[in-house]
């Protein structure tokens, strides 16, 4: 298994083959029409961005995870994956805990947020495992009126030491 900075082709490959639920979630938040246009848009937007990573195995890329600054101290966390996510899920979770969370601490993040379509409980449970808290429901946020939940980690709520591994459940 590998976890490294993503190449544009890898972003495209994961995006064009992403899980149906991921497609519905991300497509609801973008101007694109259809899977090809969405994949091309994600490739163009994320393909050369520094904080975009790919996780995969010998068969190819499986997951793209990114963290993007929205403004000083505020970051957005995102992820999309193929149907083979379970093959790298535990490995990826460990990489996020060991690599991405410390990077966000070093960047002095005081807020990390993520929006996820209502009803995607598998992902909501995982976000909570990572230490994000369910904050609110944003009604009608999607282009077809879909409701989304906002999950966040806020330094003030976590204490002055930041988003430390000690504040996150131990990963098996």
Please name every model-derived segment.
Residues 1-18, 22:
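A short beta-loop-alpha structural element at the N-terminal edge
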Residues 28-49:
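Active-site rim helix/loop that mediates acceptor-substrate recognition in acyltransferases
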Residues 49-54, 64, 148-150:
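Short hydrophobic/aromatic beta-strand element in the GNAT-like acyltransferase core
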Residues 54, 59-69, 75-78:
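Conserved beta-strand in the GNAT
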Residues 72-86, 92:
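Conserved acetyl-CoA binding element of GNAT-fold acetyltransferases
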Residues 77, 140-172:
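C-terminal "cap" of GNAT-fold acetyltransferases
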Residues 88-104, 129:
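Conserved acetyl-CoA-binding loop-helix of GNAT-fold acetyltransferases
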Residues 112-128, 140-143:
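Conserved beta-strand-loop-alpha-helix junction that forms the acyl-donor binding cleft
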């Amino acid at each position: 298994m590998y976890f490294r900075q993503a190449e544009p082709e890898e972003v495209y490959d994961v995006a064009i083959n992403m899980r149906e639920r991921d497609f519905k979630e991300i497509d609801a938040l973008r101007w694109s029409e259809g899977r090809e246009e969405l994949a091309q848009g994600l490739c163009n937007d994320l393909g050369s961005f520094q904080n975009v990573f790919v996780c995969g195995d010998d068969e190819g890329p499986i997951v793209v995870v990114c963290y993007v600054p929205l403004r000083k101290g505020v970051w957005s966390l995102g992820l999309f994956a193929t149907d083979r996510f379970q093959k790298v899920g535990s490995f990826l979770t460990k990489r996020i805990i060991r690599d991405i969370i410390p990077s966000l601490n070093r960047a002095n993040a005081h807020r990390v947020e993520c929006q996820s379509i209502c009803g995607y409980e598998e992902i909501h449970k995982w976000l909570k495992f990572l230490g994000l808290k369910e904050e609110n429901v944003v009604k009608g946020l999607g282009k077809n009126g879909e409701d989304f939940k906002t999950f966040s980690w806020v330094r003030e709520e976590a204490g002055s030491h930041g988003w430390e591994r000690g504040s996150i459940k131990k990963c098996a």
